[in-house]
Amino acid sequence: MENEAITAYRQRRAAFEATFERHLAAGVVFYSADGILIDDTVEIAPGAVILPGTILRRETKIGAGSVIGPNSLLENVTVGENVKFNASQGYDSVIESGAAIGPFAHIRPDSRVCENVHIGDFVEIKNSTVGKGTSVSHLTYVGDSDVGKYCNFGCGVVTVNYDGAAKHRNTIGDYAFIGCNTNLVAPVSVGDGAYTAAGSTITDDVPAGALGIARARQVNKPQWAKGKLEKFIAKQQAKEEAGSK
């Protein structure tokens, strides 16, 4: 008598193969079935490309011309047309047409990534709207925020949305430029066309068209490192001499 686990696996496999064949016959492009799992409830438009290692769950919908994968997970996400979703995960969200996601991005629930947005590597979006044409290219957390269109986020931006008791929202206007390593301590707003200087921790609103700077002024101390450098060089020379003996 066959093991129950084996029977269950074969049933799941048969169901997947039927789903796979249905999408293939409808014009969805698969180069290989390796590592692909697709729930029967998923909708995929003809012309979409599903690459190996892709898992599509629940009520996910994929638009025509979109390329999903490799190694991606989408659960209850609506994806528009001509989206690129590479080596990333998304849950309970909307990704509009022309967006490019990944690699290694995380789209958490209740997010909307609008048309032609770029979400790059090691970016996390949570309960936020990212406006049309905005670029969030790398190493950034956007949580509980409303971001306008055609904004640019530098590397290392963090929306500081949790005070230990409650979550708060940030608002970033259209055409804003958020400098590298900016912390936006919610609730704050950055106005249309405003800039934040790299390395700033923004705790007050930045008006439209303004530059927000919130960082200590640099101080150089001449010759401060000279003694340390001399000791380090002497230590390295001693090691080299000992090793040559």
Locations of regions flagged by a protein language model:
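Short, functional N-terminal and low-complexity linear motifs
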Residues: 13-19, 32-34, 49, 64-70, ...
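Glycine-rich hexapeptide-repeat left-handed beta-helix
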Residues: 85-245
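Thr-Gly-centered strand-to-loop micro-motif
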Residues: 32, 38-39, 51, 137, ...
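Terminal amphipathic alpha-helical/low-complexity segments used for targeting or macromolecular assembly
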Residues: 1-47, 207-245
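Glutamate identity and glutamate-enriched acidic tracts
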Residues: 2-4, 17, 21, 43, ...
